Amino acid sequence: MSKHIHILGICGTFMGGIAVLAKQLGYKVTGSDANVYPPMSTQLEEQGIELIEGYDPSQLDPAPGMVIVGNAMSRGNPCIEYMLNRKLAYTSGPQWLSEHLLQHRYVIAASGTHGKTTTAAMVAWILEYAGLEPGFLIGGVPQNFTESARLGGGYFFVIEADEYDTAFFDKRSKFVHYQPNTLIMNNLEYDHADIFPNLSAIQRQFHHVVRTVPSNGLILMPDNVPALDEVIQQGCWTPLQCLGTEHNSHWQAKKLRDDASQFEVYCKGKLAGVVKWGLIGDHNLQNGMMAIAAAHYAGVELNQAIAGLGAFKTPKRRMEVKGEVQGIRVYDDFAHHPTAIATTLAGLRAAVGSERIIAVLEPRSNTMRMGTHQQALAQSLMQADDVLLYQPAGLDWNLQPVADELCVTNRSDSTNESGIDNSHKAAIHQHINDLISDITMRAKAQSGPCHVLIMSNGGFAGIHDKLLAEL
């Protein structure tokens, strides 16, 4: 078979990462996407990968040895129809990874509704810090590295394990293909309403991956998460270690600061050390503990894992500070699920105390656009002082009820247990320029520091740079 691989949908982070790995394995790699754009296009071209914009079937003539089909591709796409009609050899990204790379490596997979990218980046960095030169494929760009994917020089391979479906011809979750030796299950909630009818359907996929973890491997998960407990109750053939607050948990963390920027690490009830780092929030504490546990099982000494975590930098788009102008700090975060929104805001609130927080949200994920989480959205934003919602064209539901719920009129009845006033001023905008003007006005209207937290899993029309320029 020809060593030429052609990737359909190459500019996504996952498929672009596969392109980089295939190139490093010695394949000739080409690919196409509907829109070829930086930064992924730049990364790929620097690797010597030829990119084609659009899906004209001529790109498949002469036929490559293998077509790797991204999960965004569907029937009716000209390249897909040509590929099927000509009976070209094709596979999915996860299946190709399994057959050509993961079979020969010790795989550490980070799964869960939230925290996959950050946890995978933490594990990869701790292994790197320990001199183990791991390979990795991560859905964001870890700031401790210069790329989102690399082959690595060691035995270990760290992968962000996504439960989204594999391809138009394989509706199993991607992670079912990864053959993990160590599986991290961070959490589990209902998400991806476009492909999963209910939580049970997602749990079924999680149990499929649990079934593939060998008996000499490891499964890591938090205590007291009923949705994960139910997955394990369906059958588990692998040693299980849990993170929790109970003394009988294998792993425990004790916060030394409310914002979780310092915490003690306990293993089997014994103090192993203290993490002091630049991240905040209970969600990041849990991500970090999972990473320490996974790295320790891979052979990293606990003191070295703790030191490595202390030197970890959050991946881009995870509470990433984009800039600060006259005491107004602008953050970018990938949060797009009510739980992630709430935990991100709670972490920021713990860090900044009573300083003003303006939360800006674009409901862009498929699940959010369908309105699946609309009932929980207002509650998830309660830690912010101001909430500005972007109503993009094509959103299937109206954001006004969320804004109405946030606009509490009686200030005396709206203080939460932490003493933070939850009498919100919420607004909805349909145009980016109007949204930026409103953020600017609100941020400058108050004396003292202000924190603008922008949350979206998309580009949000470049709002961060535009806002900083306006400020």
Regions found by a protein language model. Name each.
Residues 1-36, 45-51, 62-67, 85-88, ...:
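ATP-dependent carboxylate-amine ligase
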Residues 21-24, 45, 59-62, 71, ...:
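Phosphate-binding loop of NTP-binding sites
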Residues 32, 54, 93, 137, ...:
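Generic beta-sheet signal
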Residues 34-37, 55-57, 73-74, 223-227, ...:
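Short, polar loop motifs at secondary-structure junctions
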Residues 52-55, 93-98, 137-140, 236-258, ...:
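Beta-strand->loop->alpha-helix junctions that form or flank phosphate-binding loops
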